[in-house]
Each structure stands twice: as structure tokens, then as C-alpha cells.
């Protein structure tokens, strides 16, 4: 952060928010390739890419930008990328990475100045991702309906540019952003129905992540504004929001727009018990009210996306589910609030009678169907979930094959340790263990019986997690304490780092 402050003060761009001249500074591209500053941990497939981003390449890029960038924008040329020259892919990626660093500077400086100037206000609306787990345990069982939402991606580059205008007043940076979206990143290929927009694009994940977060923040900003206006509740989280350009003017504009466009539905949202939780592109809106209110919220979200963001929302992106009858898939868990009938015997005078009390219990299950589909794609089992061998790993050593299976099995056990129903997890672990044995048997051209007899019981202990292995050493496997701890529900806060287990359509990445 101090580096950014020094650079901005030296060039004198902090007061006027002019970011475009920073594009011609060599240190910007050095910062773009500084892995200590790059929190997104970009992994490039081309191992020699960092060697190409030398000082000479940056100087040559700066010279080309000085000489020809304006000609590329205004000249009537059939090749819009001619100014980049023969190193089109290299220079375009260098420019986009440098631009990604530049656009993050205002947000970092404003947040730092806010934290240094005053204490952080307590927020009940915006909390850490780790607060999802206590929310499920404490509040989820008391709610009735949930709105399962897939946030649509912006399909028009101009919408992202308009969103960015609220943060930066530099017109040149806005033109450059528009130029990147239209020319370099082949926007049309990103919005085809068969391909979803990957915010972690291999070309520049940091840049696309920034654009995606800007879009989601704009969506949630309007959502919470109307939420607070409709319920007549004072917002307790406005202090922790990033400062905007013309913030109050934007709020007044929203009041005018939604008073005209949504005046017929604004009065409908008066439920003070709505809970909003989001992780990446999926969000849930849970409430204790009637399904009529949830239908009104659904109608509001669809109109917001279509009229304000110009995004056509498919009907399947918003579902209304009853928590007692249906499960929702969130963070890789199938969660629902099941009704349990508890019979309590009471005695008054000499007459005994039974009182039935209905209690709600929060349950989380392993998405067994999705996991088996992913195992089938990775060739660990057939569609009927029968384990098969992994012939592509036959060239590896025995220890390497076992370690790969053990790592997959431990990741699954660690991630789904918060599940209350682990029968599906036991089945997945069984498939992986048997698939490992069959892979080794096929490699050595032996039989399963002979191979297991040679390995012994220690082979299956390798598939236990470190926590399970430690508990097994303290308590006997046959004891009640071992069974209770082994089947207990534990939320590990580091499971959010296992991103592939959240979206099961990309789960095959874990099984490679």
C-alpha cells in the first residue's frame, strides 16, 4: 500500500483521480508481476512467461503505447490490434494486467484512509464468509422459505463501464476499459449459451475478478438500498462501504428511478426478517414469511436485472423452495430444515397425557449424485457408481498412485465434515478406495484378494484425515466416543479455499 501511495504522490494523480497516465509507467507492470501483491495467485500455464516480462519488454511496450495507441483507436484500420505488433498476446496481456493494478489503486487507498481515520463500524448486513456457518446453525432452522438465486453475469460491456464510472472520474481510463472489453477479450465468445463467463479467466483472472465484483457490488448496493427503504430500518453498514464518487447524488438518483419504475412493488417489501447470503455467483434470500412475499422478491430481482442491468434472466436462475420439503445446494452442501416431532410426557394431577412438540432441525447432506457424476467423468467409477480402475495413472509409482487417491479422499472428508448425514460421504470414500485398489491390481496384474492381503489393514488407514487419524489413536474404533466424534459435524473455516468443491460442474479438476 505504501508503494502505491508513493507512486501516486510522485506523479500527482491522487487528487484528480487521473489513472490513465499510470499506464505509461514501467513500475506498474512490475507491480502486476509481483506475486506478493497479486492476491489472486495467478498460475500461468506458460512457465516461461515471467521471463518475457522483462524491463526491456516493458520499455518497448511503453514506447509503443506513446506512439501508436491513439492511432489504433481513431484510425480506420481493418486490424484493430495492429499497434501491438507481432507480440499481440504478450503485450495485450501485459497491458490488461497493468490496467488491473491501476484500477485497484483508488479502492485500496480509500479503504486504507477510512480505516486509519475512524473505527470500523459494526455491521450486521455485510459479514465475513465464515459467518455463513453459524448462520446455518443458528438462523436457518427458524426460516420457512428460501429464494435460490444465480446472479446473472453482465452480457453488455457498456454496463460494466457505466458501473465503473461511479468509482473513477478519469474518462481516459473508461475509454481504455471499453476498448479492452470490446477488442481484446472477445466478449462475444464469453456470452455464448454453452459457455458461462469465467471470472477466473486464464488470460487475466485479476482483471475479470475486479469487473465481476464491481458488477455484483452494484447489484447488491441497489438491493440493500431498497431493502432498507422498504422496511424503514436504518442502515448500519453504510459506514463500511467504499466511498463513491457523488455518493449521495447516486442515492437520490436511485430514489427517483425506482420511484418511477418500481412504484407499484416498492411497498411490498416490508419483511424485517429476510436474510441474504452470497458466495461468488450464488446467493440465497431466506425469510420466515409467506411464499407470496418470496414471489414478490423474485419479481423484483428479475425486473432489476432486466431494466437496470439490461440482463435477461432465465427462469431457472431463481427458485423458491420450502426449507422443510426441499434442499438447497449452497457451498457444496445440500441443506434443509427438517421437521422433527418430539413427544414429551407430562403429568398433571393423576392424569398423564402426551404433548407433541414440533421442532425444526437443520440438516446438511453430501450431494451424492453430483459427486458420483464427477467421479464418473474422472473415470473413477461407472454411471452406476461401481468403482473401476484408473488406467491413465498406471505409469506412476505405487506410492504416487496411493497418495493421489488419499489426497482426493481427505479433501472430500475435510470439506464435508460439516455434514450431518455422512452416509453419502462414506460411499464416495468407498468408491475411491476400491478404485485405488483396482488401479494397483491392474498395474501389477494381480487379484484384489492377493493385493489386499499383501498390503494389510494399514492401507485403508491412509485414507483417514489427520483429525480422524488422531482421534483413532486416542479412542478405540469400537468405542462410543470414537463413533460420536467420527460422525459429529465440524465446520472447518479453511474449506472455502477448496473452490472446486463449491461448483460440482468443475469438480473434475480436483480428481486429476
From Swiss-Prot:
What does the record give under GO molecular function?
Answer: RNA binding
* Gene Ontology cellular-component terms listed: chloroplast
InterPro entries recorded: Domain_X, Maturase_MatK, Maturase_MatK_N
Superkingdom of source: Eukaryota
Q: Where in the cell is it found?
A: Plastid, Chloroplast
Which keywords annotate this record? Chloroplast, mRNA processing, Plastid, RNA-binding, tRNA processing
Q: Which processes are annotated in GO (biological process)? A: mRNA processing; RNA splicing; tRNA processing
Family assignment? Belongs to the intron maturase 2 family. MatK subfamily.
Q: What does this protein do?
A: Usually encoded in the trnK tRNA gene intron. Probably assists in splicing its own and other chloroplast group II introns.
Q: What is the protein named? A: Maturase K
Protein's organism: Koelreuteria paniculata
Amino acid at each position: 500500500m505504501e508503494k502505491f501511495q508513493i507512486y501516486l504522490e510522485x506523479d500527482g494523480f491522487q487528487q484528480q483521480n487521473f489513472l490513465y497516465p499510470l499506464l505509461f509507467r514501467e513500475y506498474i507492470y512490475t507491480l502486476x508481476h509481483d506475486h506478493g501483491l497479486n492476491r489472486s495467485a495467478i498460475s500461468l500455464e506458460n512457465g516461461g512467461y515471467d521471463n518475457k516480462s522483462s524491463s526491456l519488454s516493458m520499455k518497448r511496450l511503453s514506447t509503443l503505447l506513446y506512439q501508436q495507441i491513439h492511432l489504433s483507436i481513431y484510425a480506420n484500420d481493418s486490424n484493430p490490434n495492429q499497434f501491438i505488433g507481432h507480440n499481440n498476446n504478450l503485450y495485450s496481456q501485459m497491458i490488461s494486467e497493468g490496467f488491473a493494478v491501476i484500477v485497484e489503486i483508488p479502492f485500496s487507498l480509500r479503504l486504507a484512509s477510512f480505516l486509519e481515520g475512524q473505527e470500523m463500524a459494526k455491521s450486521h448486513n455485510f459479514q465475513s464468509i465464515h459467518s455463513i456457518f453459524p448462520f446455518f446453525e443458528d438462523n436457518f432452522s427458524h426460516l420457512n422459505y428460501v429464494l435460490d438465486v444465480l446472479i446473472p453475469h453482465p452480457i453488455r460491456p457498456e454496463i460494466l463501464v457505466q458501473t465503473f464510472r461511479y468509482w473513477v472520474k478519469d474518462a481516459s481510463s473508461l475509454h481504455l476499459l471499453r476498448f479492452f472489453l470490446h477488442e481484446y477479450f472477445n466478449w462475444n465468445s464469453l456470452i455464448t449459451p454453452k459457455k458461462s463467463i469465467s471470472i477466473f479467466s486464464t488470460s487475466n483472472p485479476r482483471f475479470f475478478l475486479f469487473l465481476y465484483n464491481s458488477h455484483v457490488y452494484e447489484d447488491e448496493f441497489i438491493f440493500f438500498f431498497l431493502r432498507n427503504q422498504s422496511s424503514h430500518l436504518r442502515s448500519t453498514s453504510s459506514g463500511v462501504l467504499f466511498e463513491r464518487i457523488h455518493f449521495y447524488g447516486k442515492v437520490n438518483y436511485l430514489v427517483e428511478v425506482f420511484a418511477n419504475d418500481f412504484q407499484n412493488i416498492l411497498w411490498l417489501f416490508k419483511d424485517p426478517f429476510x436474510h441474504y447470503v452470497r458466495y461468488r455467483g450464488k446467493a440465497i434470500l431466506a425469510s420466515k414469511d409467506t411464499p407470496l412475499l418470496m414471489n414478490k422478491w423474485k419479481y423484483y430481482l428479475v425486473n432489476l436485472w432486466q431494466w437496470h442491468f439490461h440482463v435477461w434472466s432465465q427462469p431457472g436462475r431463481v427458485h423458491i423452495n420450502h426449507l422443510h420439503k426441499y434442499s438447497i445446494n449452497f457451498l457444496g452442501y445440500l441443506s434443509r430444515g427438517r421437521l422433527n416431532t418430539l413427544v414429551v410426557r407430562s403429568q398433571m394431577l393423576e392424569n398423564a397425557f402426551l404433548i407433541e412438540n414440533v421442532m425444526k432441525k437443520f440438516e446438511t447432506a453430501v450431494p451424492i449424485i453430483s459427486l458420483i457424476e464427477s467421479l464418473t467423468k474422472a473415470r473413477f467409477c461407472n454411471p452406476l457408481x461401481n468403482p473401476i480402475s484408473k488406467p491413465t495413472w498406471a505409469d506412476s509409482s505405487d506410492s504416487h498412485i496411493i497418495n493421489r487417491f488419499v489426497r482426493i479422499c481427505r479433501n472430500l472428508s475435510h470439506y464435508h465434515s460439516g455434514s450431518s448425514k455422512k452416509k453419502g460421504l462414506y460411499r464416495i470414500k468407498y468408491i475411491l478406495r476400491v478404485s485405488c485398489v483396482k488401479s494397483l491390481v491392474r498395474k501389477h496384474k494381480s487379484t484384489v484378494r492377493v493385493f489386499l492381503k499383501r498390503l494389510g489393514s494399514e492401507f485403508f488407514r491412509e485414507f483417514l484425515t489427520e483429525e480422524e487419524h488422531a482421534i483413532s489413536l486416542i479412542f478405540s474404533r469400537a468405542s462410543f466416543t470414537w463413533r460420536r466424534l467420527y460422525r459429529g459435524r465440524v465446520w472447518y473455516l479453511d474449506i472455502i479455499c477448496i473452490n472446486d468443491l463449491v461448483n460440482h460442474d468443475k469438480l473434475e479438476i480436483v480428481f486429476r
